[in-house]
Amino acid sequence: MVALLLFPMLLQLLSPTCAQTQKNITLGSTLAPQGPASSWLSPSGDFAFGFRPVEGNTSFYLIAVWFNKISDKTVVWYAKNTDQDPSIVEVPSDSFLQLTNDGALSLKDRSGQEGWNPQVTGVAYASMRDTGNFVLLGADGTTKWQTFDMPSDTILPTQVIPCNKTRNKSLRARLDIDDYSSGRFLLDVQTDGNLALYLVAVPSGSKYQQYWSTDTTGNGSELVFSETGKVYFALTDGTQINISSDAGIGSMADYFHRATLDPDGVFRQYVYPKKANAGILGGETWTALSMQPQNICHAIVSDVGSGVCGFNSYCTFDGTRNQIASCQCPPWYKFFDEQKKYKGCKQDFQPHSCDLEEATALAQFELRPIYGVDWPLSDYEKYEPIGQDDCGRLCVIECFCAMAVYNQSTSTCWKKKLPLSNGNMADYVQRTVLLKVPSSNSSQFMISTSSNKWKRNRKHWVLGSSLILGTSILVNFALISIFLFGTYCRITTKKNIPLSQASSKSQLPLKTFTYKELEKATAGFHEILGAGASGVVYKGQLEDELKTNIAVKTIHKLQPETEKEFMVEVETIGQTFHKNLVRLLGFCNERAERLLVYEFMTNGPLNRLLFDNSRPHWNTRVHIALGVARGFLYLHDECSKQIIHCDIKPQNILLDDNLVAKISDFGLAKLLLTNQTRTKTGIRGTRGYVAPEWFKNIGISTKVDVYSFGVILLELVCCRRNVELEVVDEEQTIVTYWANDCYRSGRIDLLVEGDDEAIYDIKKVERFVTVALWCLQEDPSMRPNMLKVTQMLDGAVAIPSPPDPCSFISSLP
């Protein structure tokens, strides 16, 4: 009976899989990529050392250390060839790794040819430890070699990186998530005692430019990941400079920790819950506790190299908590390789030939404005002072010019040629990028070429060209004029009121739909997306090649007031284009029917996301707040005429499939003339969001939108409506009052109680609340403009303490 009980235990001890969990790995032990034993485990099984397949590649394996108990088996170390050749060791499937009887660790192929070894001898045994360190030891227990001394892109708790003597004591980012080749970023523990992040050349690793550092000096400094989960830079005088933090979310017993220099150049500290569904930050996934630098898109502006992203692309955040940098191509450009976006973008059209005459170039190319994006240091010529039309013309006619950048406030123009570098999307960018692309009459991005100045100049250029070329252009112009005149006649015969004034002011060509077209597109106005005072919004789909989803707003009960709202909406949004404004695709003005056709927003209005049972991530709310602010900045300061929205509320902020915020519903908007700062109008807007001056006999300005934005900003911070009658504490009924009380008492944390992400980022929470209180000042002159608001939200300027707002709250009758 005893023998029967012991027999299963004996089989288990002899099992090759179980044998790999022993503390010491003896001489003669062997691993094979596809054999019964492909890895050696640490005693707890938390870590493994051995052969790790590369996702999406079945031709070779890595020699690696990885987290063994989590689903994605995250790799924390991988073997490289030599210091002089830091390329990864690619292991064919027929190879084997052996701790040989003569005391060496050796990778060999089927023929016995050695492919890699760590260049040490006299090894008595090896150990895969629960710290994630794989160690080769001598008979006396001394360390001969260890992975902690040869870091790849990650450090683990208890790991220390001393002052750099050779390159492999630094961290080198991967080229991409699934590409373990040496990447474009380096974290260097320097001999001068400075810890610095560098942009580097691929594949050589030559340093380009430092983009973050501790600015410290002194031999003997070291980068430490303590056993308590704290990452810091230790100086010789005992000073500790915190690089990242454990954020107090739990003990080391509850979470796996790592700090990685990611492929986007950010050094992040991550945690992962050891038990399923035990993560405070939600889910079985790696969550970033902190990162350096805070904004990689803004951190790198390099004289050489492409910047964070590849050439001719630009960097933007993905809006998640981990703030992964995402690379995008500008319009009419495409990635060289969609799977390897770091390679950059190329023009998706035939480039401008230098053999073209000026008039031909003007006919073949046009400019498209892009807002909130910049490519610093790529300019080769500068003009000042100059108008925007002339700035654009000079780029269009020159074959070297890929884009022009214009600063309205200084009347400065920069011309840029390919390749473009250091591209980034930034809230503070106030310049307009004019991208040169092939001419298209149907372009929605086209800069108006109908200005009198541009027309006069074009006339002179055509007259100055050859007779044959001039004749060709005149013929084309005549044909286009006939087409436009015919279109105009067709439109005006179908309409009861003229829209020529609105459309002539618009820089964007709007499509005119028939009522039958929209009735068919909406399946008989079947699916309702929402309803308001003046009409209902339906979901539809166009019968184009892309089967474009649309939102169709119907204007009911056609009266002078609703007719006016329809005209205002067409005139206002029809002349705007910005990533944070909903795009008007067209309209129907047939007999008594008034319909507006918009791009469809997948995630609906903000109130649906914000006031649902599940709270959106803090970084998502930050991303939305910055987007709304950016949209208002465009309306107030960057349009040809200032636009006051007058009815901003969560229902009028829509979210696309990437949760990018877009301002909508311009039916109550007011246009200000160039010399106007205020306008008189009746009370507009929604209770709870309207500014105090609406109730006074004074003109209103863009500051009414600033006030409404302040209310929405607090709703985004607190994840609750401005007025909540069903609250336990009566002082919390009105969020504007409550936020002011919390700010004055130094208890901002109460506004985000239970929101661990926001609590961790409490300084930004305080900054946002402070900005909101400035926006809520009763005196409009005390409120900042939207340029100042975006700067304060972005942390670009200091924010003084706001005065205590007046007790007037527009949410009350």
Swiss-Prot record:
Which biological processes are named by the entry's GO terms?
Answer: defense response; response to other organism
- Looking at the record, the residues that make up the PAN domain are 354-433
Carbohydrate-modified residues are N24, N57, N164, N168, N219, N242, N407, N441
Q: Where is the Bulb-type lectin domain?
A: 22-149
Q: Which locations, inside or outside the cell, does it occupy?
A: Membrane
Q: Which reaction does it catalyse?
A: L-seryl-[protein] + ATP = O-phospho-L-seryl-[protein] + ADP + H(+); L-threonyl-[protein] + ATP = O-phospho-L-threonyl-[protein] + ADP + H(+)
Residues forming the EGF-like domain are 293-346
* Extracellular topological domain residue ranges: 20-466
PROSITE patterns per record: BULB_LECTIN (PS50927), PROTEIN_KINASE_ATP (PS00107), PROTEIN_KINASE_DOM (PS50011), PROTEIN_KINASE_ST (PS00108)
Q: Where is the Protein kinase domain?
A: 523-797
Membrane topology, from the record: Single-pass type I membrane protein
GO MF, one term, reads: protein serine kinase activity
Residue ranges in the Cytoplasmic topological domain are 488-813
Q: Name one Pfam family in it.
A: Pkinase
Q: How does it assemble?
A: Interacts (via kinase domain) with ADF4.
UniProt name for this protein: G-type lectin S-receptor-like serine/threonine-protein kinase LECRK1
Q: Which gene encodes it?
A: LECRK1
